[in-house]
């Protein structure tokens, strides 16, 4: 039997207008990176029968940030960008294992989210995420039990914002 289990706690967050702008930039960047590299993989696969790996795309993302037209990507947390590439890689692997259909492009009008794997803080009345200096208010209605692993910030179609906190707990 497994000695560890993962559990997620979901809470509503209440960002200010400035924080909403910041979060929307994060959502947009994650969507852009996913779609840009999905298009790149698709084009390569059609031309050569092969496509870049996650690691090759991570290197390409790093060099993209140095280009003038993609300079705005420096405002985005690098680990959040890498998480978008990991999601794309997982979608590709599932497609080739015939578990799902071919990965689709992400749309702005759909549910949006991004993952923050490190360098965040959970405070008594909110959270702090990288590149955003202010605290985002959060209503914690349950106690968080376990070792916190990552945060996922999401936005619904009704423009409500949530944080999902992934924790690792001992299996008893």
Give residue spans per PLM region.
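Nucleic-acid substrate recognition interfaces
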Residues: 1-172
């Amino acid at each position: 039997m497994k000695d560890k289990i993962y559990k997620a706690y979901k809470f509503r967050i209440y960002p200010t207008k400035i924080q909403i702008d910041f979060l929307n930039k994060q959502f947009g960047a994650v969507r852009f990176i996913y779609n840009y590299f999905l298009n790149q993989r698709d084009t390569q696969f059609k031309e050569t029968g092969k496509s870049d790996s996650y690691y090759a795309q991570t290197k390409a993302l790093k060099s993209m940030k140095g280009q003038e037209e993609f300079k705005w990507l420096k405002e985005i947390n690098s680990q959040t960008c890498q998480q978008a590439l990991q999601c794309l890689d997982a979608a590709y692997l599932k497609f080739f294992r015939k578990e799902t259909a071919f990965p689709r492009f992400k749309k702005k009008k759909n549910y949006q989210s991004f993952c923050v794997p490190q360098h965040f803080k959970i405070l008594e009345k909110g959270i702090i995420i990288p590149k955003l200096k202010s605290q985002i208010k959060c209503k914690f209605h349950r106690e968080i039990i376990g070792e916190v692993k990552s945060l996922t910030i999401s936005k619904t179609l009704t423009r409500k914002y949530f944080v999902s906190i992934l924790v690792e707990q001992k299996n008893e």
